[in-house]
A protein has these predicted regions:
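Low-complexity or membrane-interfacial segments used for flexible interactions
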Residues: 1-77, 83-86, 94, 99-101, ...
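Aromatic (Trp/Tyr) and acidic
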Residues: 90
Length: 228
């Protein structure tokens, strides 16, 4: 784990790690979830820098009944703590039937941005917004029925929606890991000089993408509708 950093002017407490010069990527590993039991537990993530040092630990807080009935459609809070055990980021996802979103707060109680899903028939699309709901970035994903074919890239683009300035990558899991759990790994890449708040919001986008598209357990409600 990395040692605590000095508070930086204009950077929310706890986001100093994201404001470091040279930090251009984050890596997420999810703990084993729903292993063998078939029931979804609260997700937990290790968040590391590019040299493998853990800088944050994220833990979901959601209702067990709601989690196992509605699965990836559930609402939740994600509490993110630094290595001192201080909660520095909170993410709030309401339960919605469509066009999902997540609010990112740093410190908890102070909104720094939103991730909002856009309407699209076949391709995942999201907008990254500031606290005033002004769109700053776009995220564009691939045709997801092909998601078993290797690493899956979600491109982070500017307002013109042309050139990529970053990327969220779902890295392919090993066969054994996929058999026993929902364990996944992600890499988030962004410009070195990106604002620390926007890096935190992209982290929220990654967590939302993981739960929306790559979580397999739960969702008993949909199974009942389909007659299992």
């Amino acid at each position: 784990a990395v040692p605590p950093l000095v508070q930086l002017y204009g950077v929310p407490p706890g986001l100093e790690y994201l404001a470091q010069v040279g930090l251009n990527s984050l890596f997420l590993s999810i703990y084993l979830s729903g292993m063998l039991t078939g029931f979804e537990t609260n997700n937990q993530y290790e968040i590391k820098n590019s040299i493998g040092q853990e800088i944050y630990h994220a833990k979901e807080k959601s209702n067990c009944f709601i989690r196992n009935i509605f699965g990836s459609a559930r609402g939740f809070k994600m509490r993110i703590k630094d290595n001192m055990g201080q909660e520095v980021i909170q993410m709030d996802r309401p339960m919605r039937c469509c066009l999902q979103e997540i609010e990112v707060q740093a410190p908890p109680g102070v909104t720094i941005g939103y991730v909002k899903q856009e309407w699209s028939c076949f391709f995942p699309k999201f907008s990254i917004l500031d606290p005033n709901n002004e769109v700053l970035l776009k995220i564009r994903g691939p045709f997801l029925p092909l998601k078993c074919c290797g690493d899956i890239n979600f491109e982070v683009k500017g307002m013109l929606d042309e050139q990529s300035i970053g990327r969220i990558t779902k890295q392919r899991s090993g066969f054994i890991k996929k058999c026993i759990s929902d364990a996944t790994n992600f890499c988030i890449q962004f410009p070195i000089d990106m604002d620390a708040n926007m890096k935190a919001v992209l982290l929220g986008a990654c967590l939302l993408i993981d739960i929306m598209y790559f979580e397999k357990g739960g969702n008993l409600f949909l199974k009942l509708l389909k007659g299992f």
